[in-house]
Structures are given as C-alpha cells and as structure tokens.
C-alpha cells in the first residue's frame, strides 16, 4: 500500500545483476489437481527474445529449480531509486493447450520464486497466446495510498447473508481486480492461502527478516479476514470479498509468482489473526510503506523491516505499531477441507483414525502425482507412510521432514480436494 512520490525510477541493467535468485515453475491443466507433464518451458529476460533457459516439466508438472541473475541485495534492504529485482518472461507450450506467456516474473536475490501456471485447453472460443502481465511490486512501483478506515466495523444488519459468530477461514477469496465500482474489472476465485501468498509477495520483499515477513503476513491475514467476517463489500451490494486496489485493500496481481520465504510463513499461520480484548472480529490492520506514505498508528512496511533487523519478534513488531493490547487468535474452522487438523502432529509410530485419513488422501493424490508411493490404509504411520509424506512435502514445497503437522495436514487436504474434484469432472 504505497504511492511513490518522485520522478524517474531507473531500472537496473542486466550487466549489474551481480547476485542470484532461484526459480521453479509448476504447470497444471487446468489446476493443481492435475499436473501437466512434458510442458515446454522457456525463460528470457522481460522484453527480450533470447532464450536463457529451456526445460521440460516432470510427472509432477514441475521444472528443476534454477538460478537466475538478480540485482545486489542491498537494493531490497533500503528504499532506493533502483529496482531491487530482475524480471523475466516465461513461455509455456503444450499440445492441446493454449500457449501462455507470463510477463514480469520477479526474482529477488537470495530467495526462491515459485511460478505456477494454469493451462487452458484450446477450443474455438480460446485461440492464440494467453498473456498474463505481473504488476510492479508495490514497494517500487506507483500505487495509490490506502484510504483510512475504522479498524473495527459495525456488523451489517441481516440481509440474507449469515455473519458467523466466530471468524472462519474461507475456502476461496473472490478478488475484484480493480476499484469497487469498476464493473469492467474481472472477479477471480482464489484459494485463501494462495491469495495471502500473492498479496504478501506484492507488498513486501521476501529477503527481509522472517519476523518481519511474519508480522506483515499476520496484518494481511487480519485485514482480509475482517473483510470476510464483516461481509464488507457484500453489504454494499457487491458480489466479491475484496479488491486489488491499494486505495481500498491490498495489492494483488493475478497469476504472479510467489516466494518460498513467504509461502512457508503463510502455510504455518494462515488461520491466525490480530484482535483486541472485547472484540470478536479480526482487526482491519491497515499499513503503508512508511517512506513515501506516512500513516500514524498503522504498521509501516519499511519500519517493520527495521525492527526485524533489530531482532524484534513478529508480535512485538505488530504491538509497536498497533498498540500493546493486541493479541493473536486462531480461527477454529477451515472451510473446504474434509477434516480439521487433529491438534497433534502425526509421525512414525502414530496410530489413529487421523493417520487412516491421511493415508486415504495420499493414495488419492498419488493417482495424479505418481511420484508419491501408494500406502496401506491401516491407520498405522509406518515407513511407507513416512516416505509418501516426504515425497508429498518435496513436491508441494514444504519442509520434507516426514511429519504431518499443521501445514502439511492442510496442504494434503487442499490437494486432495483439488484432485478429487478433477476426478469427479472426468
């Protein structure tokens, strides 16, 4: 949420790319429930036809992780007039599907970027290349500042929509890709955690301290869940959850790459939000960059980075900006998953009905992701189950420890739902 006040912002040239970031591409047809194998992937500098890398996706729809040139890390540690990331174009080609180009994939030094691509079948209504252009990062580009709002909303009167007594994590966020009254802007249905990862990748740099990333993710979560809980836009007659306009909400760039350093944090805490004593709803935790826009009593992104550098924890960073009476809560219900996390990690030696559930789900997922071995469904967490969990974690970019904790449980649930939906459609 920022607005650059100033003149020309120079773009660093490729000769100055003295460091590296990493990139992995995942391809799906049409979504994560169906990986796309043998897709031709080409990478070039943005606006340049010269191909830097050419790869083929594996049975999980993924390319190897590759290193790509990036600017010096100093440019993302302090506000400068030089863009702190390099950008690339990705072209994907697969028989029977529309060729696709992702323009402006952002690579930060000392980070790993993930670019997932959803392919569309060729038909009479969709021909030619499909192009997705990623917006500038908000800390470097020009964006309107946030219009201030009250952090606690009056709940709307009953209009047919049910305001739940306690915050719930929705399965999807409906993002209006523009200002609220722009009827020409499309709406996108985005899985909740995927939406949070997209926003955070737009709003902060992934090579910042982990406590800074966590604090900013918590603010994004709380803001978003306030919009969900209060039915803010539906109460005004709109058919979406939130917008992509920084004047009203967060930045969101459809189809953009996310970063591993942000993704890991989101997977660990996506049910958490910020609140105050005596308040049931998540706070509308507004923020700005703190350099080009000043926002008293809100978190500043660059200020949170400074505190992270000084060793502050995520909650102490948040309290420094929003007040020392704030605290964290967790939503107890996640929509769209068959069974909630049991509360205790499952690992070698565990025996329970929850182990049986994970075994059944992993077997279903392995029908589409054959690198995952089949397991006996017996409720006993043995070596076969551990190996299947580790392979799942490797494919879906989680720490491959073979333990089904909070993040792995919900990731397995999410992929299981996607895979079974594809099977039903088939």
Question: Where do the model's predicted regions map?
Answer:
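Conserved, single-site charged/polar hotspot
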Residues: 3-10, 14-16, 38-42, 56, ...
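Structural motif
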Residues: 13-14, 18-37, 45-46
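Short coil/turn motifs at beta-sheet boundaries
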Residues: 18, 34, 83-85, 110
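Short, ordered coil/turn segments that flank beta-strands lining enzyme active or ligand-binding pockets
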Residues: 31, 46-47, 59, 95
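Short loop/turn motifs at secondary-structure junctions and domain boundaries
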Residues: 46-49, 82
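A short, solvent-exposed beta-strand micro-motif common in secreted/extracellular proteins
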Residues: 73-96
């Amino acid at each position: 949420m920022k607005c650059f006040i100033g003149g020309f912002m120079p773009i660093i040239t490729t000769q100055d790319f003295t460091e590296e970031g990493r990139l992995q591409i995942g391809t799906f047809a049409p979504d994560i429930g169906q990986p796309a194998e043998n897709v031709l992937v080409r990478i070039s500098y943005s606006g340049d036809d010269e191909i830097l890398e050419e790869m083929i996706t594996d049975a999980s729809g993924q390319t190897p992780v590759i290193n790509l040139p990036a600017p010096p890390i100093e440019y993302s540690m302090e506000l400068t007039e030089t863009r702190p990331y390099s950008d690339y174009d990705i072209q994907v080609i697969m028989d029977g599907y529309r060729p696709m180009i992702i323009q402006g994939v952002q690579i930060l030094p000392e980070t790993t970027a993930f670019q997932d691509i959803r392919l569309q079948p060729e038909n009479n209504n969709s021909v030619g290349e499909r192009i997705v252009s990623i917006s500038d990062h908000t800390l470097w580009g020009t964006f309107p500042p946030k219009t201030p709002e009250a952090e606690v909303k009056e709940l709307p009167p009953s209009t047919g929509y049910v305001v739940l007594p306690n915050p719930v994590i929705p399965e999807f966020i409906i993002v209006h890709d523009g200002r609220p009254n722009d009827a020409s802007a499309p709406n996108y249905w985005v899985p909740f955690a995927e939406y949070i990862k997209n926003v955070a990748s737009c709003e902060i740099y992934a090579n910042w301290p982990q406590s800074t990333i966590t604090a900013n993710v918590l603010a994004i979560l709380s803001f978003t869940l306030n919009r969900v809980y209060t039915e803010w836009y539906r109460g005004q007659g709109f058919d979406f959850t939130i917008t992509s306009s920084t004047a009203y909400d967060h930045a969101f760039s459809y189809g953009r790459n996310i970063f591993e350093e942000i993704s890991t944090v989101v997977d660990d805490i996506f049910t958490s939000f910020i609140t105050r004593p005596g308040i049931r709803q998540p706070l509308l935790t507004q923020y700005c960059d703190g350099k080009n826009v000043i926002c008293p009593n809100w978190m500043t992104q660059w200020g949170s980075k400074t505190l992270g550098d000084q060793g502050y924890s995520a909650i102490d960073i948040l309290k420094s900006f929003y007040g020392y009476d704030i605290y964290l809560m967790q939503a107890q219900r996640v929509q769209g998953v068959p069974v909630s996390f049991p509360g205790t990690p499952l690992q070698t030696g565990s025996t329970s009905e929850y182990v049986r559930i994970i075994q059944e789900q992993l077997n279903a997922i392995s029908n589409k992701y054959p690198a995952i071995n089949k397991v006996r469904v017996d409720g006993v967490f043995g070596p076969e189950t551990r190996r299947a969990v580790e392979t799942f974690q490797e494919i879906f970019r989680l720490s491959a420890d073979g333990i089904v904790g909070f993040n792995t449980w919900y990731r397995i649930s999410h992929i299981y739902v996607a895979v079974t939906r594809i099977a039903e459609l088939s």
